[in-house]
Amino acid sequence: KNEFSPYAQTKSIAEREVLKAHVPGKMQTIALRPHLVWGKGDPHLLPRVIQRHRAGKLKIIGDGTNQVDLTHIDNVAHAHICAMKAMLKNENLGGNPYFISQGEPVYLWDWLNQLFPRLDLPPLSRSLNFKTAFLIGSGLESLWSLFKIKKEPPMTRFVACQLAHDHWFSIKSAEADLSYKPVIKMNQAMEETLPWLQSL
């Protein structure tokens, strides 16, 4: 939830300002919402997960059945091109946000457990229930704030929510208005990204 993440809060504020600036026929603006971007060169999502697993510090958060959307970087780039072309064709198009993803939600922990053996890592079996993870995140945030530690805590309330809950979205609006279609599917994206992940 946004109230647990300054990053999400500031993105929401920026999006509102961008959409508010839309003036049909004069200045066109839209907002693209790619979800959990990954791929070769990703400095955040998968490298962090892999690093924590190698350090023995990764557990399944929640019951392990949550579905999430991921978006390969090629599809993010393609969505921007689709948006540009759509706005050039229709000067009145704009003022709306569009979710961008693979259009193939995955069971997060199953997906990761299929990946780990290909990186010479064992599948995860240890778990931590969501309420406990959330409370740990809340406590760590308070400690980090009290001692003015700049580095992000190993667990936060926002991360607990992201790792334990469903978060996937319809891309029908992007398909209809922007003619967006994913150019690379999950399986192909993983095969193309795997050599880079193995090199980390």
Question: Where is each model-derived feature located?
Answer:
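Conserved active-site beta-strand element of glycosyltransferases/polysaccharide synthases
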Residues: Q28-A31, K59-I60, E91-L93
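Amphipathic terminal alpha-helices
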Residues: F169-D177, K181-L200
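Residue-level signal for the nucleotide or nucleotide-sugar donor/cofactor binding architecture
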Residues: S5, V68-D74, V106, F169, ...
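Alpha-helical membrane-targeting segments
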Residues: R48-L70, L124-D166
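Active-site Tyr-X1-5-Lys
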Residues: N2-R33
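Proline-glycine-enriched beta-turn/loop adjacent to the NAD(P) cofactor-binding site
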Residues: H35, K40
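Mid/C-terminal beta-alpha module of Rossmann-like enzyme folds, strongest
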Residues: A86-P154, I171, N187-L194
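Substrate-positioning beta->alpha
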Residues: Q9, I13-A14, D42-R48, G62-A86, ...
